[in-house]
Amino acid sequence: MNSPLRGIWLWLPLLLTWLTPEVSSSWWYMGATGGSARVMCDNVPGLVSSQRQLCHRHPDVMRAIGLGVTEWTSECQYQFRQHRWNCNTLDRDHSLFGRVLLRSSRESAFVYAISSAGVVFAITRACSQGEVKSCSCDPKKMGSGKDSKGVFDWGGCSDNIDYGIKFARAFVDAKERKGKDARALMNLHNNRAGRKSVKRFLKQECKCHGVSGSCSLRTCWLAMADFRKTGDYLWRKYNGAIQVVMNQDGTGFTVANERFKKPTKNDLVYFENSPDYCIRDRETGSLGTAGRVCNLTSRGMDSCEVMCCGRGYDTSHVTRMIKCGCKFHWCCAVRCQDCLEALDVHTCKAPKNADWTSPT
């Protein structure tokens, strides 16, 4: 091989590394990695050195994070259940979502936020349940306190959300902090918005003590709300996400359109418009909507017109078993009958383009 060609071949792997976009949060794959924490730490691809160090030092926290992946991906799928892109995950893909999140879109903003929130939630819950050696209940919630109802004593186990946020920041943001590009700044912003969203729904719960429930004495603690509240909140932020561009010195954002308000730390931000997700597309990672169930009577995103992108739909007649004729029997059971229900199911037609059958 002559010298110029040989030089090109030597540089080719490095050029491909520079030019190929990468989904940063390979730690998402921790939920799919079985075995011990050590096996998980060594086999999740793409972790930076500080993430691997935290992984080996805190195997109990990593187990919590791994279990939490299932929870936040399920919440993502719930929020997008009626949309063309439904937060579907890919088996044996360490990025979990494939090429879809390479684009700096609203969907990427939401996934980074909900995943960061999921880590905070999972770690904080594990602390309260005594599953993490390095943390427990919130040590600051001791002694007495006061609210609109009067004085109370801190007791029980207040969720140590500050520990969850601190660990999540150190672990999740580690790879983004190594990068100085626009996408890294976008991810860091949305990660922070996700962490803050969990703390927003921290609520005070109390138990009354006293003669005949007089509540002359109260014991209170702080508890995280159900993760659905965080998911609903971030969904609203997704719908109000703000498109931005990098400022001139490359240190932050400015709005892409002067009509938009400046994003706060609680807002989600994105750079690129989303694809329509109508058809399978190798470049964008879209799986398309062929075969998706649609709602014939809806006028929303789940309608057959919108979901199927104007391609039409097929209708199949199916029967399913449901509970019916339920009656309450004293005391204390509800008994139901099993009934067959006939219904029509509408699914989106595939495009006529033969390329549809090609795998992504």
From Swiss-Prot:
Lipidated positions per record (O-palmitoleoyl serine): 212
CDD domains: Wnt_Wnt2
Signal sequence, start to end: 1-25
A GO BP entry: positive regulation of transcription by RNA polymerase II
Compartments reported by the entry: Secreted, Extracellular space, Extracellular matrix; Secreted
Glycosylated residue positions: 295
GO molecular function: cytokine activity; frizzled binding
GO cellular component: cytoplasm; extracellular space
Coiled coil start-end: none
Disulfide feature: 76-87, 127-135, 137-157, 206-220, 208-215, 278-309, 294-304, 308-348, 324-339, 326-336, 331-332
Name assigned to this protein: Protein Wnt-2
Protein source organism: Aotus nancymaae (Ma's night monkey)
